[in-house]
Amino acid sequence: MKLHEYQARDLLARYGIPVTGGGVAVTPAEAHAIAEQIGGPVVVKAQVHVGGRGKAGGVKLAQTPAEAEQVAGQILGMNIKGLTVEKVLVAEAISYERELYLSAILDRGSKRITMIASAEGGVEIEEVAKTNPSAIVKIAAHPTMGLLDFQARELAFRIGLRDGKQARQFAQIAGALYRAFVESDASLAEINPLVIKNDGNLLALDSKVLLDESGLFRHPDLAALRDPSAEPEAERRAREADITFIKLDGNIGCMVNGAGLAMATMDVIKLSGGEPANFLDIGGGAGKEKVKAALQIILSDPNVKAVLFNIFGGITRVDEVARGILAALEEVPTDVPMVARLVGTNEEVGRALLAGSKLIPAATLAEGAQKAVAAARGELVS
């Protein structure tokens, strides 16, 4: 689950991490009041769950409360990558000397929580990894004792913080960020940039926190922060239908049962020269209604040029999947070509149900992926 910037800022502040002053506004008048309370220049920032807000005009500097009200009026209601801005963060504008980067992630390679730091903050860490990988420092926390003090100090030293006061502050912030990550069941806790202000003190200027959906039952206070209006419509519908769904940038929709099989399906699509439009796992034992909801979600993406069904029926019955596909197509007629690889429990019944449809059959995953790629290119018709 994604937190808005203002929610992430408030969460980190609970752990003693210094953050900017300010507040969230849903009207221009509220933005005016917050800026007036701050009493100096402010930054008005759109609160939406997408990147590139600044380039889209969703981040603006305001020198006065009146200007803050004006720019808030421009940003509120703005459409950024398909999401409507309903809230803005009005934060004090900070003068600073240097930008740093700091984050906590779960490194699945080492199977440990890893702290990442860089002297090059303010830009995407992925870009730094490409252009100057030596500027990135990684230290894995101890699996039972957590991030140790000497590790936090080592992070500070290795990114070039030689001033004792700044190094101590950085180490304290790193320790606090680690605790926030662990105690919130986060999958990412990031401060970018972590700035050194003109007075020499450190401050978290922007932050990002992603929470593990599977851990939210332990954190009702954090679960209550979910903003359905800020989620893409497809992701909201998938969550309500108990479907695991992640939108991607390709044009081949995928419906699969099982996360491992779904990842393998995406891999084979790419190996066949295509690009998956989504990760979608209907789970074990999915019935007709869930399958119907899943297909409707896939078809709601205008980029989808073909759909691949890869169902291995164990707990999930192939005939139930077939009924769900037919039910969805009755409600949402489409010309999008569809390829079906259906094997397992009741597969003969499922195939018989789909025999009169326009679905393109495939005996293997490789064949299904190749046919889906060809269909997306307009080279194969049902």
From Swiss-Prot:
Pathway: Carbohydrate metabolism; tricarboxylic acid cycle; succinate from succinyl-CoA (ligase route): step 1/1. Residues 9-237 form the ATP-grasp domain. One of its GO terms (biological process) is tricarboxylic acid cycle. ATP binds at residues 45, 52-54, 94, 99. It comes from the Bacteria. It catalyses: succinate + ATP + CoA = succinyl-CoA + ADP + phosphate; GTP + succinate + CoA = succinyl-CoA + GDP + phosphate. The keyword Nucleotide-binding applies. Belongs to the succinate/malate CoA ligase beta subunit family. NCBIfam families: PRK00696.1, sucCoAbeta. This is Succinate--CoA ligase [ADP-forming] subunit beta. The gene is sucC.
